Amino acid sequence: LNFEGPIIKDRTSFNIGLRRTWLDVLSAPAVAIANKITKKDGTRLRARYAFHDLNLKVNHIFNDRSRMYLSLYNGNDVLKGGSTDFPDQDSDNNYNYDSDVSLRWGNIMATAGWTYVFNNRLFGKVSGVFTRYHSRLRNTEHDVVGNEGDEDYSDSFRENETNTGITDFGLRTSFDYMPASAHHIRFGGDYLVHRFHPEYNRSVAYEKNEETSVEIGQEFANDLLWGHEAGVYAEDDWTLSSAVRLNAGLRFSLFNVQGKTYTGLEPRVSLRWLLDDNLSFKASYSRMNQYVHLISNSFISLPTDAWMPVTRKLKPLISDQVSAGFYYNLNK
C-alpha cells in the first residue's frame, strides 16, 4: 500500500508505504495438509516466515531557500519452525515432546534534516539520524512423559536465547560550494554515538518429577559497549579540461571507546582522462580506517551476526586501495 498527498497546500506533503508478505498466509494450508498426513505417525509440524516494512516521509517547504524533511523506516522479519512428537494411534505410551526455534530481526531508521540555499554557489544540509538493528534467536524444548502423579512422570523444559544489536544516533552536516564552473567543493562533518550489544545470552531450564523439582535461570555474555565517532572532510571535484577531471579530498576521523581515542587521516584522489570518445584512463587511491567490524560465521551470513568496535587492545584496521586501468565504451 502507498499513500501520498498534501498536508498543507504547497507547503507540507507526506508519503507513506506499507508492505507485508503473504507467504505465511499462503503456506498455512500446506502445513495443515502435511500435519493431517503425519498425525497418524505422531508428528505435528510448525513453519512460518513473514516480514513487513514501513516507509514514511514528510516534507515541508519554508520558502524557496529553506526546507525540512522527516523520514522513517521500520522493518521486521520472523522465521519460525518446530515440531511436536506424541504417541501414534497404535501406541500405549503417554508422552509429548515440543521443539521450536524462532529467529527475529529488524531495523529502525529515522532522519530529520534541514536544507538551506545560501546563494547560487553554496547550499548546505544538517540532519539528525537514529538507527537500530536487533536480532533474537530462541530455541525451546519441552518434554513431558506420563501424567502428573504417576511414578514414571517427568517434565523438562529448556530455553536458550541469543540477542545481538547496535544502535547509532548523531548529527551530520554537509555543504556544496561551487566557486567557479570548474570546481565543485564538498565539505562537512559528523558525530555519531554507537551503542554496541554484541551478544546477550539467556538460558532457562527446569526438571520435574514425582520426587524433585529443579529450576535454573542464567544470563551470560551480556556485554554493552559505547563508542563515539567524529569526522570532518573536504574534497574538490576539479574539471581541468574537457578531457581531464580530478577529484581530491581528505577526511579526519576520530573514534573513542573504553577511554581510548584513535585518530586517522583518510586521503583520497581519483583521475579521469578521456583519450577519445570511447577510450579513457582512470586511476584512484584511497585510505580508510575501520573502527567497527562485523563478526560473522565464515560459512554463512545470518541475521545473528554481531557488530563489534575496536577496543583498548584491538586497534583499527587501515586499508590502502589503489586502482588504475583503461576503459573502453562498447555501446557507442
Language model feature labels by segment:
Residues 39-44, 93-101, 109-113, 154-162, ...:
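Extracellular loop and loop/strand-boundary signature of outer-membrane beta-barrel proteins
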Residues 1-5, 56-60, 110-116, 171-177, ...:
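Residues on the lipid-exposed face of transmembrane beta-strands in outer-membrane beta-barrel proteins
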